Amino acid sequence: MSGFSLEKFNFVLLFPVLSLLFWAIVLLLLDAFKKLSRNFYIGASIIALFSTLCFLLIYNGFVLDNSHAFFDLFVSDNYAIFAQIVILVFSMLYLLMDKDEQKAEFFSLFLFMIASLILMISSTNLIVIFLALEGSSLALYTLIALRGTHNAISSSIKYFTLAAVGAGFFVFACAFVYLKTKSLDLDNLLHSEYISDPILLCAGVMFLVIVGVKLSIAPFHFWLKDVYYGVHTNFIAFISIVPKIAMIIVVLRIFSALGGGVKFEYIVALLAIFSMLAVSIVALIQKDVKKMLAYSSITHSSFILAVIVSSMSVSSQGDGTSYLLSIFALFVYWISFAFANYGIFLILSLFQKSSFESFSGLFDQRPVLSIMLAIFILCIAGIPPFGIFWGKILILASILNSGYYALVFAVALSSMIMLYAYLKILIYVFFKKAQIVESANLDVKQKIILCLCLIGSVSCVFLLL
């Protein structure tokens, strides 16, 4: 083949994926031949993640930036590189803060899932995105079910069933895109003469189903509450943050390609408004902190969807500066939420029960822990001067700049409704009559991570400047 060249493969770009897959296979084989301690598997997994992170930090801007691999099936741009770094950092934080006894295959599946997430955000080809999406999803279903309890298995099956329906819609959407454009590459779709075709609008609506499932946007969120109640508390923090980061990048790529001529952003805006308002009202009547936080994560995902609507609008207008503002607002908001969310669930993992009443009078018994919990709660509520407040200001500025005033009103109203739900737990912690609270103690690693989460949730916006 005269046109064949090894340079077109560009294996350097795929090193993060290949490295994590190698470590996943090694850990799986080690478990088959010799039973090793849990600490060994945690250490090996962290080494795998950290070495991949170092590679990204060292080679960013030298080899990876705006380069392609495997005949343009994979791309490495600034958004993908930054998202990969965030995924690796919060994956390591999860492994360090988790004290639950996990089986050896858990860590192999965990690395396989992270590799699939990185692959998903590194491609602009719909088939590659779909394969990586399903690879990460299959690993996640299994990780949820590995706990072995009835709740864990049933929630995993419910998630699998709903996601399988979403995957079917994704395949149909890909078929529609190929039918009209004769291409499955999103870069080609951006410059397609068929961008205003109604068939592509139908494809966008079908894509929206899998997006709703993966980002847990109402009315595709029914699996989330069961998962929150069925898995280990620290793992809840992970699945509510890390898999969604990869999906957010995919949504940005797909919706930016579809938002040029069919005014697809109107449909996405309506879904975001419905999701954030409906779920905020449901969150008010919850009697369990975990379930309330499940609905809280849905509202935050809806806010992210609102930013994506803004980015779609300004991207179709060719306003590069406003588009960058939208992306910056998205990352500031989600990273601030990630730190605060990790902190909250790390504290919740110390308690056997998660009802509001079980936290009554916690301040009288553990004042420092109560104050830290209050800071994290106020952070996700968007109270100044915490990081999410600045992220939400950037979100509102971005949406205003794109002209979606109804979306701005919906974000503000949803935030006010959720504020009451957040303050409810603080009322129990600080003002309710004290009762005996059964709780464990933080080890040294968890104390360090809790402090890091506190710093990150308060000052994230300044760290990113």
Curated annotation (Swiss-Prot):
Keywords: Cell inner membrane, Cell membrane, Membrane, NAD, Quinone, Translocase, Transmembrane, Transmembrane helix, Transport, Ubiquinone. The chain crosses the membrane at residues 9-29, 44-64, 73-93, 110-130, 159-179, 198-218, 235-255, 265-285, 292-312, 327-347, 371-391, 405-427, 444-464. GO terms for cellular component: plasma membrane. It comes from the Bacteria. One of its GO terms (molecular function) is NADH dehydrogenase (ubiquinone) activity. NDH-1 is composed of 14 different subunits. Subunits NuoA, H, J, K, L, M, N constitute the membrane sector of the complex. This is NADH-quinone oxidoreductase subunit N. It comes from Campylobacter lari (strain RM2100 / D67 / ATCC BAA-1060). The lineage of its organism: Bacteria, Pseudomonadati, Campylobacterota, Epsilonproteobacteria, Campylobacterales.
